[in-house]
């Protein structure tokens, strides 16, 4: 399946009963559930590796005919109908009459009884009646999408977004589809073009320009240069004439959607964020030193002059940066600062961008910590933070410490500093790690401006110096090959040095052999030798999603090994089952839930009558019961991309490293992957791929003017 969940490959059987020949289907099938029956339109082609396959251009669902097929359709397509309820429906109406009778009057579900004559729970009945009405609308929409060459798997999302009037909405302005996450401009454009919209239609051009800017943001850019925008729009829209594009951009500027500033094109919202954040940070950088509290070192706590220097800076300056390499003492410095500030009766807030990072901060410092979103009291119903300039954090705190600050995007940093008030703020991070997932590079821009007081710790402490993980990470950071064996490390560092055997390199050359080695390491060798639980303690981190050693392939293989058997399927489309390890792919701020992007969980069990799943999160500290629909935002997580692992650490980490990833390999990517390991890291793959990554020291450039805005404020 592709990253946007649109493209997928399925193995299908022909015929209404599924008893015909097997065929490989490729195309916009990412939202299709296993066991679905489809009518597909497309062409047969011959693939050089996979042979003959059917390339699906569009499809629609076909209703099943058999009793088993109807029951399966009910459980996979209608929320609230579990296996017991589905079987009772088929027995009551007969397989050949279920759709006819329920389309006519879904209230007839109230007549259904179990095989023993018991009534179906009222809650399940009400949910199923409401769901049937929605599904009926979805089936009508599938026909509409099919006629316009769009995969019918999107229908459910569109109905949830636009309601019963969805066909009228899409006919009136197909480009409204781009409002939905993970549905691209090209899908909307296919509908629009099939409805007769011209290439140079003004609505089309404006939607295309918006999409190019949004895609740039997803790559971390706050803006695009005009030339970059024109080139991206030309490729997307297939319009070579600049004049209509300039007219469309002018319209977006007049409508307040876009800001053009010195050849830089921003979405207005991002321009406002960057400008506001620049002013807030600039004011802190220019502020005269003022003592927040008196401080004396605690003689019972060992602290270096550099570490105590951080305490002195934070005590007197409203914004301080603490950066440093692994093992340099950033965490110990935070502990010293918190202990000193609390002795002075300061109110201290510890926070981090992710829940995993906040828990790690809590465990390492011994003090409570929370996500930045929780600290700022994000309200999902209002889509805004309750803490702001009118209700600042300084009403409750004197000092704010933010860990993993390299993950701060423009949006999150803007919200934080808009609400900081008179608090002194310490940002702690490692600028050599990957930049944030969202637009901007706040910590790197602050460092580059050289306007904000910064302490960069480099010394390696004795306990950390024993770790080959830390020694190798430091070598990677400086462009040198990591120690590929403990013997090599001892030879380089001195034969009598004490070292922990916590970093290994396993040489493999072909992608398939790398994959096999990863499976053996995760499932057998690491548990047997080191005692780690392969389900709970070992994480595989990969550079990219596709390929034989990509995220999808490894997750499928590891699911078979680590969650075998016929455990109950919870969400058919994604293959999530009871026992699966899963990861949240977008922030969920639902009251009493709050699961952040990147949080890992286990599916403990599934109630098919209530259509709810019970999850274990926070390393077993928390359990949640969620509707199965909420699991649409989760993916299997025996393996994660390195990017998604930011802010997290795991007891044991396995990193496949292949030249098959060559376009993605870089020094920051390898450095970030290695530093996710707490006790054991195994790098598996090709030495040449490691060398290639080390040679790419620079991260991909991001368009940001935050440092420039800071410098401008310094001269005001």
Name each model-derived stretch.
Residues 202-206, 214-218, 253-312:
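Pre-P-loop entry segment of helicase/translocase ATPase cores
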Residues 288, 310, 330, 432-592, ...:
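Conserved helicase motor core of P-loop NTPases
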Residues 1-8, 42, 600-604:
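Structural detector for short beta-strands of small beta-barrel domains
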């Amino acid at each position: 399946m592709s990253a946007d969940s649109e493209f997928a490959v399925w193995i299908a059987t022909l015929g209404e009963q599924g008893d015909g020949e097997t065929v490989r289907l490729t195309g916009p099938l990412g939202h299709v559930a296993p066991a679905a029956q489809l009518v597909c339109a497309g062409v047969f082609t011959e693939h050089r590796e996979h042979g003959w396959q059917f390339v699906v251009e569009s499809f629609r669902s076909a209703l099943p005919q058999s009793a088993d097929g109807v029951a399966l359709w009910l459980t996979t397509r209608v929320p609230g109908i579990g296996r017991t309820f589905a079987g009772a429906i088929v027995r009551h109406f007969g397989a050949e009459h279920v759709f006819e009778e329920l389309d006519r009057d879904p209230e007839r579900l109230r007549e259904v009884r179990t095989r023993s004559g018991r009534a179906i729970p009222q809650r399940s009945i009400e949910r199923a009646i409401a769901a049937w009405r929605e599904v009926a609308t979805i089936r009508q929409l599938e026909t509409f999408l099919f006629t316009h060459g769009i995969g019918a798997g999107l229908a459910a999302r569109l109905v949830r977004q636009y309601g019963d009037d969805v066909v009228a909405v899409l006919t009136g302005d197909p480009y409204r589809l781009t409002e939905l996450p993970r549905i691209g401009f090209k899908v909307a454009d296919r509908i629009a073009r099939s409805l007769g919209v011209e290439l140079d239609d003004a609505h089309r051009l404006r939607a295309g320009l918006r999409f190019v800017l949004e895609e740039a943001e997803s790559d971390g850019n706050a803006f695009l240069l005009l030339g970059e925008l024109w080139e991206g729009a030309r490729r997307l829209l297939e319009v070579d004439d600049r004049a209509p594009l300039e007219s469309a951009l002018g319209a977006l500027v007049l409508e307040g959607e876009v800001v053009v500033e010195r050849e830089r094109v921003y979405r207005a919202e991002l321009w406002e964020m960057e400008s506001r954040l620049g002013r807030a940070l600039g004011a802190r950088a220019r502020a005269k030193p003022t003592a927040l509290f008196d401080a004396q070192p605690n003689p019972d706590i060992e602290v270096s002059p550099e570490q105590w220097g951080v305490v002195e800076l934070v005590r007197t300056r409203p914004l301080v940066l603490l950066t440093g390499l692994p093992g340099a003492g950033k965490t110990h410095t935070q502990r010293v600062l918190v202990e000193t500030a609390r002795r002075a009766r300061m109110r201290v807030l510890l926070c981090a961008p992710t829940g995993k990072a906040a828990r790690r901060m809590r465990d390492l410092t011994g003090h409570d910590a929370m996500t930045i979103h929780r600290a700022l009291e994000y309200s999902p119903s209002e889509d805004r933070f309750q803490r702001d300039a009118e209700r600042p954090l300084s009403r409750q705190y004197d000092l704010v410490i933010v860990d993993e600050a390299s993950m701060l995007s423009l949006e999150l940093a803007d919200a934080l500093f808009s609400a900081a008030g008179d608090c002194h703020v310490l940002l702690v991070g490692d600028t050599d790690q990957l930049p944030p997932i969202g637009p901007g590079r706040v910590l790197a821009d602050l460092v580059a401006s050289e306007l904000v007081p910064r302490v960069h710790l480099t010394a390696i402490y004795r306990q950390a110096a024993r770790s080959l993980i830390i020694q190798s990470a430091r070598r990677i950071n400086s462009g040198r090959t990591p120690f590929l064996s403990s013997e090599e490390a001892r030879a380089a560092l001195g034969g009598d040095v004490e070292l922990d055997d916590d970093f290994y390199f396993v040489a493999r050359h072909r992608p398939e052999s790398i994959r096999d080695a990863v499976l053996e390491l995760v499932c057998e060798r690491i548990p047997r030798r080191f005692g780690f639980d392969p389900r709970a303690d070992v994480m595989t981190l990969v550079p990219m999603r596709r390929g034989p050693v990509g995220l999808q392939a490894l997750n499928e293989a590891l699911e078979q090994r680590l969650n075998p058997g016929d455990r109950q399927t919870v969400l058919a489309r994604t293959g999530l089952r009871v026992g699966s390890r899963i990861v949240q792919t977008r922030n969920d701020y639902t009251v009493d839930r709050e699961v952040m992007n990147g949080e890992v969980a286990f599916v403990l069990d599934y109630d098919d009558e209530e259509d709810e799943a019970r999850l274990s999160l926070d390393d077993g500290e928390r359990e949640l019961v969620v509707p199965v629909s909420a699991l649409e935002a989760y993916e299997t997580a025996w393996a994660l991309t390195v990017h998604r692992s930011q802010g997290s650490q795991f007891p044991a980490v396995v990193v496949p490293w292949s030249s098959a990833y060559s376009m993605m390999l870089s020094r920051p990517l390898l450095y970030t992957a290695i530093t996710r390991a707490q006790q054991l890291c195994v790098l598996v793959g090709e030495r040449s791929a490691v060398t290639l990554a080390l040679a790419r020291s620079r991260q991909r450039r991001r368009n940001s003017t935050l440092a420039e805005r800071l410098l401008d404020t310094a001269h005001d």
